[in-house]
Amino acid sequence: MSIISYGQNLEKLIKENIAKRTDTLVHFKTDSPYNYMPVTILSGKEKGPVFTIIAGIHGFEYPPITAVQELIKEIDPKKLKGTLIVVPIANVGSFYKRTPFVNPSDHKNLNNAFPGSETGTITEQIANYITKQIIPQSDVFLDIHGGDANEDLLPFRAMSLS
């Protein structure tokens, strides 16, 4: 597993890996014990589009987190054209502390923190990293949710046509 720090350019890591899986941790500048975000990059044998999937914006939404972890196991980079970036748990603090909606370190909802701030709280830094480092690298960006502990959700989808 490699480790990259906040502000390191993800683009370089994406371009360096061909037909390879890279598991990395992005670290943020904070005193929070959960000051990191796991990222898996599956780079295909051939160049192609970059597809990003993020789960765990709300760390208590377990089904999407489990789904992307299973997906990572199923993908063979040698059979992939392009790159798949997966963030299985964007809000690590919320996941480990089992707190619905907010990060326990700063009590902020990551879903409402975008575009974030490089010098802000842990939640704002995570949002900023996703906004500045991950989204610009992505041809397709999918943020999946599953409903927190006290929610019942009806299936739906939303898509921007721009």
Identify the role of each PLM range:
Residues I3-S162:
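Structured catalytic-domain cores with a bias toward divalent-metal coordination
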